[in-house]
Amino acid sequence: MTGVDEILNYKRNPDDDYYALLGCDENSTVEQITAEYKVLALQYHPDKNDGDKEAEAKFQQLKEAKETLCEPSKRALYDKWRQSGIAMGFKQWLGMKDHVQQSMHWSKPNTKDRMLEGEPGKPSGPSSLGPSNPGARRASEGGAALWGRWGAGNQEPPSEVISKFRNYEI
């Protein structure tokens, strides 16, 4: 099967979802991931399941998932692959990541809804520290961060034309 056929006929393997494999969420901390791993590793460890090939394979998957999710650089790559929705496995994507990422510059990362809603009409989070105009919002919230990191400083606001251009309104 060629690489293109593999991509076109790709069916996502549930074992590729490291978060589900470990019983974690994408917002889990390294400590939470490690704790979940320890519980499952004890259950599937080859010493406790002598001769059980399935338990040994599961243990190897758990180990790989933990190693990937506990190292920040690997986790960032894994999350990028997971959110891309691209039709290939994580290992295949890793082998081609430099080529694939060149064509993913347009993709928008999936973000979860915020747990706490601010007051209606009032922004919440880091954007509430700076100006509340659309140009000061993060790009993921429908605006470009034109005011620098937190909107502090003595910067003058950009012209209306520049704001519209940067927000893809013209």
From Swiss-Prot:
- Sequence ranges of Basic and acidic residues compositional bias: 110-120
List the keywords (alphabetical): Chaperone
User: Gene3D superfamilies from the xrefs?
Assistant: DnaJ domain
Show the Pfam families listed in the entry: DnaJ
Region ranges (Disordered): 101-170
| Residues annotated as domain J | 17-82
GO cellular component terms, alphabetically, are: cytoplasm
What InterPro entries does the entry give? DnaJ_domain, J_dom_sf, JDP1-like
Q: Which CDD domains match?
A: DnaJ
Query: What's the superkingdom here?
Result: Eukaryota
Q: Where is the composition biased (Low complexity)?
A: 121-135, 142-153
By what name is this protein known?
A: J domain-containing protein
> What is the originating organism of this protein?
Manduca sexta
| Gene name linked to the record | jdp
